[in-house]
Structure formats: C-alpha cells, structure tokens
C-alpha cells in the first residue's frame, strides 16, 4: 500500500511544479509584451492625457511616459532624433513638417480634439479689459501671449490680433511666454493685465482667472490637435493602441470634462 501512495505524492508534486511553471511562463510572456510608450505632447493636453493614461494603463499591459512642452520645441527635438513613439501637437504645422522630413507616418495621422482661444484676466484685477478692443486702453499695460513661432497658442493669438486689426497697436504691450501654461501663470500671478490662452487652460486655473472674451473662429486657423506615430518609433503597435484609445468613450469623457471639443467630422487627416 505504501508504494501507490508514494507514487500519488510524486504525481501531485509534478502537477504542482507544472502549474507553477505555467504561471511563471504566462507572467513572463505578459511582461515581455508590455511596452513603455514615449509620447511628446502639447502642454495644454497635460491634465487630460495624464488622466487618460491612468485609465489606459489600468486596462492594458502597456505603460505611457509623457514629455510635455510647447509643440514647436517638441517637434524640433524629434527632428533631431529624440526617442519618441508618437507626437500630439496643438497645431498642424509641426506635424506637417515631421511628415515632410520623413520623421512621421502620414497614414497614422488623426485629429484627437479641438480647442478654443480665450482672453483671460486676473480675477482680482480692478477695472480689467472686457473685450479684445479694450486691450488698447491706457489702463492695460502688459498682455501675455505664447511665442508665435514655437507656441501654437501664440500663433493663434497673433492671428487673432492681426485679423482684429489690433496687432500693431498692441505690439509694445505684449509679453511672450515659452508655452501656454507660462502665459496662464503670468495671469494667475497678476503679472500681466490679460493673456490669451486656450479655454481648457482657463478651466484648469479655476477661479484665479476670468474669461472675458472668446476669439471668433474666423479670426484664426482651426485649433486642432493632430496625433501621429513616428517612423523611428520603437513601439509602433503600442503607440497605435494608445492613439486608438484616445478616441474611445472613456477618453472622450475625460477630454470633454477638461473643456476640449470633439471632432464632428472624420478624424483621420490627409494633408498636402
């Protein structure tokens, strides 16, 4: 009777070892397929993308690392070989240039969200401007904009001032920020009398700033956020999974809660 019992124990031990081996194999396989994606993105997307990435990571083995900043410098870094998998810009120009130089895959290009441009003032300001025309008043000293050459928000702001015939009259009052969040900080700290930022940035600032005017849509190029995967990406499949997730219902809910506008037409882009 002792021999069969010993044999049974050996079989149980072998089964346990096999089960443990299978668990370890599956764990290692899952880890092997988990990629860490590097995304360079416009800083105005920081709050929304950070929240979306948490949801994405909870549903995926992939991880996301962000490099936030002004779209111009981020695109320049990519042109110079920065190890990035995907790029989300606050304007089309930067993505156009990356595609022309062969750095980005045009077939992956898509519009993620839209935004609006607003004029904000410090909430605590006394007798602040109430419109774009008011910016010419003597009581208005400094007006903050993003640097038009490198910051899309600054580009849209300058287009607006030019189309409203105010750019020349306001040139001596303008203070340039390195990115749209720096412009927002200037207003929050009451270092300027007004600033031009995205509606989403004004929302982030809460009750520290007040929106006094919205730029007419006809006064500037549409504020689109195009995303694209780079041709040098080391995790192209994972990057595509993340870009696809950005157009999912959970991601859309987060974008809307942050004040972004969803595209109403086709999201894929084909540009000359």
Regions from the PLM with identified roles:
Residues 10-11, 28-31:
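Short, intrinsically disordered, low-complexity terminal segments
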Residues 17-29:
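Bacterial N-terminal signal peptides
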Residues 34-68, 72-82, 87-92, 96-105, ...:
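Exported/periplasmic ABC-transporter solute-binding proteins
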Residues 2-20:
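Bacterial N-terminal signal peptides that target proteins for export
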């Amino acid at each position: 009777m002792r021999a069969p019992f010993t044999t049974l124990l050996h079989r149980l031990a072998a089964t346990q070892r096999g089960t443990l081996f299978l668990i370890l194999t599956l764990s290692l396989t899952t880890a092997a397929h988990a990629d860490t994606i590097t995304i360079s993105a416009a800083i105005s997307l920081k709050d929304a993308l950070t929240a979306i990435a948490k949801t994405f990571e909870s549903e995926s083995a992939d991880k996301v690392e962000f490099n936030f900043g002004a779209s111009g410098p981020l695109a320049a870094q990519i042109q110079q070989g920065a190890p990035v998998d995907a790029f989300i810009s606050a304007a089309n120009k930067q993505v156009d240039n990356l595609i022309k130089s062969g750095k980005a895959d045009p077939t992956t290009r898509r519009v993620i969200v839209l935004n609006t441009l607003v004029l904000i003032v410090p909430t605590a300001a006394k007798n602040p401007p109430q419109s774009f025309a008011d910016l010419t008043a003597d009581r208005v000293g400094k007006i903050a904009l993003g640097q038009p050459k490198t910051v899309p928000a600054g580009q849209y702001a300058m287009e607006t001032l030019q189309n409203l015939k105010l750019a020349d009259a306001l040139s001596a009052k303008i203070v340039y920020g390195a990115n749209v969040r720096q412009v927002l900080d200037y207003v929050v700290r009451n270092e300027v009398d007004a600033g031009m930022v995205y509606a989403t940035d004004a929302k982030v600032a809460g009750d520290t700033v007040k929106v006094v005017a919205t730029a007419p849509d006809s006064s500037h190029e549409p504020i689109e956020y195009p995303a694209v995967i780079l041709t040098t990406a080391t995790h192209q499949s994972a990057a595509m999974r993340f870009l696809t997730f950005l157009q999912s219902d959970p991601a859309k809910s987060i974008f809307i809660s942050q004040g972004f506008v969803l595209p109403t037409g086709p999201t894929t882009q084909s540009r000359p």
